[in-house]
Structures are given as C-alpha cells and as structure tokens.
C-alpha cells in the first residue's frame, strides 16, 4: 500500500495527550504487531552485543526485554511513569528509580528507561530502534523528532525504523501513516528492507495496512 505526499492535519499530541492516554490504559497502540519482526531483522544489522541501543518513545515495548536478553544495553525514553512502571511489572523486574538530570531513571534487568522528554536527551548511542516514536507523531512534528533522533546516533550508528502505511481517509492515528518519500526525507540514506501486511482485525477492517522496515546508517 503506497500513497505519497499525505499531510496529516494538525492535532495536539504532546505530553498531555500521552499522559492521558496511558492513564486511560490505551497507550500501547502498537501492541500485538511485534513478535517475529524484530528477531527477523535485528541480527542482520550485525550490531555487536553490549552496544547501547536507544528506544525512543518506548512505552512499555517488549522489544526492550528482547534486546536486553540478547546482550544489548537498552535505554528507553518515555514520558509516562505509568508506561515505565508497566514495563517492569509485566516482565517481573524489580526496578530502581533515581533522579538523573531532567529524567527519572528506571533501571533493572539490563533495561534503563529514562522517564521524561525525549528532546532533553543529549547522549549518543551505537544503535536505535524506533517502532513507536515516529508513527506516534502527526506530520508537522516529525521533522524535529527525526532530526533529534539522528543526532543521538554515534558516527557509524544504525537505526532500525518501523513505519506503518494505511489510507488516512479510512482511520485516524496514532499510529499515523508515514509514506516512503517522507521516510527518506526524514532519514537520508534510509533503505526499505521489507514490508508486510498487518493482519489484526483493526487494520483489515479499515482496508488494510502495511508495516515497513527501514534501515539507516550514519556516516
């Protein structure tokens, strides 16, 4: 499914929206679309175990547990304390909490989640996994986000990005659709690795959607 050049009308999807969404129990909008995708693509990137991996706007993503189990140092960034607590509770990990500059640091089981604003992050990482960050943002907010994410990668770093494509006339986000022209503009040099249809009923009921996997490497 490809539809280029779609602009998403302005909406307020700032921190207040996500705090409210998590409080209502609906934050994990990508839940259930995971499973084999990460296992099928991450090993091909040949990132050395022990490398620090950034997961922006992480929510309670089980991808963080998968990465930690495979020997990576995982750093998620998430605005909602509900999501941070839920991740560690669901994986039965006792987390330690401490202030860390502008963040509250949750840490345990090889996973660190920095509770706070992603734009306050100033560290760099060997790799990043974005499955729920870019697609959580409406069109007008994505350039700033992508620019900041690119700057968080070390020279020679790699980004694994997952976007979703669907007809925005059939449903509204989040997750928002991101089409190939925009993905390449936001992440220069990004290469499409795969696309596969999403088969859950909520997608088939609105005419279908594709999950698209991209890889970008920094110079």
Residue ranges of each PLM-predicted region?
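Short, flexible loop segments at the rims of nucleotide/cofactor-binding pockets, characterized by
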Residues: 28-32, 53, 138
């Amino acid at each position: 499914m490809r539809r280029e050049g779609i602009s998403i009308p302005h909406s307020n999807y700032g921190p207040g929206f996500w705090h409210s969404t998590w409080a209502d129990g609906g934050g994990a909008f990508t839940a259930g679309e995971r499973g084999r995708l990460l296992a099928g693509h991450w090993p091909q990137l040949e990132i050395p175990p022990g490398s620090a991996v950034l997961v922006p706007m992480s929510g309670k993503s089980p991808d963080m547990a998968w990465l930690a189990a495979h020997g990576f140092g995982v750093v998620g960034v998430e605005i909602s304390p509900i999501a941070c607590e839920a991740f560690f509770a669901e994986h039965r990990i006792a987390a330690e909490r401490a202030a860390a500059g502008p963040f509250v640091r949750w840490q345990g089981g090889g996973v660190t989640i920095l509770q706070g604003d992603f734009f306050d992050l100033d560290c760099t990482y060997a790799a990043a996994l974005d499955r729920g960050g870019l697609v959580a943002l409406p069109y007008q907010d994505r350039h700033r986000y992508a620019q900041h994410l690119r700057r968080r990668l070390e020279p020679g770093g790699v980004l694994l990005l997952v976007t979703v494509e669907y007809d925005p006339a059939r449903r509204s986000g989040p997750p928002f659709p991101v089409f190939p022209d925009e993905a390449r503009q936001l992440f220069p040099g990004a290469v499409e690795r795969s696309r596969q249809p999403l088969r859950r009923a909520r997608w088939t009921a609105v005419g279908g959607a594709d999950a698209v996997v991209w890889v970008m490497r920094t110079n």
